[in-house]
């Protein structure tokens, strides 16, 4: 009964989020930042925030990202817990079936500061490309989850790590470069909160960043890695593990036969 109530609450929250995003995007057309986000940034993060300069800078960045097309919408606006998450670097896939990616005002403020940086190492812009690729991979692999307990958590972990590989590939970055950017821009600034995130398997459907970066060492989502993630989530059901491998394991690339 409690599980059914939780499902209903989640569906209601998703519906409310969809309504909010629909209204926000309708108000702003193809704009990339909500008025609420602008107000939050000026009040909490950067009083000198210049919206027009920000738009110009972001559009230049987006033109360099080849996996986005003319139908993709990048939208900076508060979401989820408005009191805690807005200054951090968080993202969400937005509406299922649409190429909308939602980012917190913290992203807008950090990228805005980058537009003034003369000798930047590009860590934040590379991380931005990786995160967009990660969220876009989520959209491509989207499927409803009708599971509970550890199996639901396990699928959450598999989705995140699979989308990490997708983000690395789409952004044309190495796992080493993404790791450097994460450690500088997120773990270095928000490490205490992020390092607690998902360390207890049953609490969160996300693994820790440390766990995710460890998985990247395989270079791709192998069947062995999928099986190990399942085991780390406490899954003993071998049929379930085999099913997850069929869904999430990348097929090895066959070498081309020599001509002649």
Q: Residue spans of the language-model regions?
A:
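N-terminal Sec-pathway targeting helices
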Residues: 1-14
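Pan-zinc metallopeptidase signature
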Residues: 9-11, 193-260
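Catalytic Zn2+-binding segment of zinc metalloproteases
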Residues: 135-153, 162, 169-175
């Amino acid at each position: 009964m409690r599980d059914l109530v939780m499902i209903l609450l989640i569906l209601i929250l998703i519906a409310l989020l969809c309504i909010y995003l629909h209204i926000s995007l309708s108000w702003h057309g193809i704009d990339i930042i909500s008025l609420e986000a602008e107000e939050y940034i000026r009040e909490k993060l950067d009083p000198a925030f210049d919206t027009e300069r920000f738009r110009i800078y972001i559009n230049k960045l987006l033109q360099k990202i080849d996996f986005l097309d003319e139908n993709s919408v990048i939208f900076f606006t508060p979401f989820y817990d408005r009191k805690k998450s807005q200054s951090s670097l968080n993202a969400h896939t937005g509406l299922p079936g649409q190429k909308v990616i939602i980012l917190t005002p913290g992203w807008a403020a950090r990228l805005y500061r980058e537009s003034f940086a003369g000798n930047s190492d590009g860590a934040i812009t590379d991380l931005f490309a990786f995160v967009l690729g990660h969220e876009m991979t989520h959209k491509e692999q989207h499927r409803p989850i009708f599971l509970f307990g550890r199996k639901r958590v396990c699928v959450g972990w598999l989705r995140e790590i699979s989308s990490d590989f997708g983000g690395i590939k789409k952004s044309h970055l190495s796992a080493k470069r993404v790791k450097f950017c994460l450690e500088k821009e997120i773990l270095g600034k928000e490490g205490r909160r992020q390092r607690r995130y998902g360390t207890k398997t049953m609490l969160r459907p996300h693994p820790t960043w440390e766990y995710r970066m460890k998985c990247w060492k395989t270079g791709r989502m192998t069947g062995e890695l999928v099986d190990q993630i399942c085991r780390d989530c406490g899954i003993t059901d071998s049929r379930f593990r085999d099913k997850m491998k069929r869904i999430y394991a990348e097929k090895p690339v066959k070498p081309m036969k020599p001509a002649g």
